Regions:
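Beta-strand/loop-alpha-helix module characteristic of Rossmann-like adenine-cofactor folds
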Residues: 111-176
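Glycine-rich, flexible N-terminal cofactor/catalytic loop recognition
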Residues: 1-56
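Short glycine-rich anion-binding loops that position phosphate/pyrophosphate groups of nucleotides
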Residues: 9-12, 80-84, 159-161
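Conserved helicase motor
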Residues: 51-59, 130-136
Length: 176
């Protein structure tokens, strides 16, 4: 079975008991970055093999992981912070598991955008999660599309591009 296990976003005390128990029963933990995940696993005394699984190797690693799942291995997928598959690796693996009839268990847990949305004071009854905007090609087209969205828009952006992104959004949407 594939387990999608959310990890804390900034505070290790947010790790759930169920997430710890799940990681302990798995044969292997797929990690976005073994250094970051190694610290997390060590903190909770979880001694499991870690396999790197990230945007640069997920296509190549997919077949081997699916083979191990078909052999009955329990495999957990974690990201550096938050829920795997939300602007992190995981979609291709989940899709392959669905296509192959492999059971998936997705644990509830942290995502960065939910607390940010709730604490923003913006309307939460309708929102659109865009994730990361394209870096170059298609960025302006995407912003134009989002400008007409009748909902709160949620974007992810890296700290070093944040000011530029906010300026671009202001140019398309205006100051509201």
């Amino acid at each position: 079975m594939l387990y999608l296990v959310p990890t804390p976003v900034g505070n290790l005390d947010d790790m759930t008991f169920r997430a710890i128990d799940t990681l302990n029963i798995c044969d292997v933990v797929l990690t976005e970055d073994t250094r970051t995940s190694g610290k997390l696993l060590k903190h909770f005394n979880i001694d499991k093999p870690m396999w790197a699984f990230h945007a640069f190797n997920e296509h190549k690693a997919l077949k081997s992981i699916i083979d191990h799942l078909h052999q009955g291995k329990n495999i957990a997928l974690i990201s550096d912070a938050g829920t795997p598959g939300i602007s992190d690796p995981g979609f291709l693996l989940v899709r392959a598991c669905v296509d192959e009839g492999i059971k998936i268990s997705c644990l509830p847990g942290p995502t960065a955008f939910v607390p940010a949305l709730v604490a923003s004071g913006m309307t939460t009854d309708k929102f659109f999660f865009e994730g990361f905007l394209p870096h170059k090609k298609g960025r302006q087209t995407r912003l134009k599309f989002l400008a007409d969205m009748p909902a709160t828009i949620i974007l992810y952006e890296s700290p070093h591009r944040l000011v530029k992104c906010l300026e671009e959004i202001r140019d398309f949407i205006g100051e509201t």
